[in-house]
Amino acid sequence: MVKYSTDPANPTKSAKAMGRDLRVHFKNTRETAFALRKMPLNKAKRYLEDVLAHKQAIPFRRYCRGVGRTAQVKNRQPNGQGRWPAKSAKFVLDLLKNAESNAEVKGLDVDALYISHIQVNQAQKQRRRTYRAHGRINPYMSNPCHIELILSEKEEPVKKEAESHIARKA
């Protein structure tokens, strides 16, 4: 059985999905996942489809050195740095669709689902080599990642009872 880093608050009202050793850049995928945290499922899927169509950009916050600015990120991040990581968006979108299917099988309300947990971890690096001048060899590494996410149903807040007026002693 696969171990997740966290357990959902209500396991009967949540669905999980995980991808391991995915050949997609860790840094781009981390920024993509961070942009989707706590987002409703339908909104997240629409957002990733817009990223693939270059209508909205992913804001780059941590791994942002050398990342250019774009007006599409102005309202989501102060310095406006962002990109359109297509491969990362496609992998995360596929994982969201997988989790949605898992939720349908469990009988959950798909319209009420939101991303309660999404996490990207570094996987083992894959080593290749490139041949350089004068007989030297340099490493040619790829940085794959593991992605895990949990979709949960929004819980309706319990309504507070109307206070009954109790006469106080004076």
Swiss-Prot record:
Keyword Metal-binding: no
GO molecular function per UniProt: structural constituent of ribosome
Cellular component GO terms held in the UniProt record: cytosolic large ribosomal subunit
Cross-referenced InterPro entries: Ribosomal_uL22, Ribosomal_uL22_CS, Ribosomal_uL22_euk/arc, Ribosomal_uL22_sf
Keyword annotations of the record: Ribonucleoprotein, Ribosomal protein
A Gene Ontology BP annotation from the UniProt entry: cytoplasmic translation
Keyword tRNA processing: no
SUPFAM superfamilies cross-referenced by the UniProt entry: Ribosomal protein L22
Recorded family membership: Belongs to the universal ribosomal protein uL22 family.
Listed name of the protein: Large ribosomal subunit protein uL22z
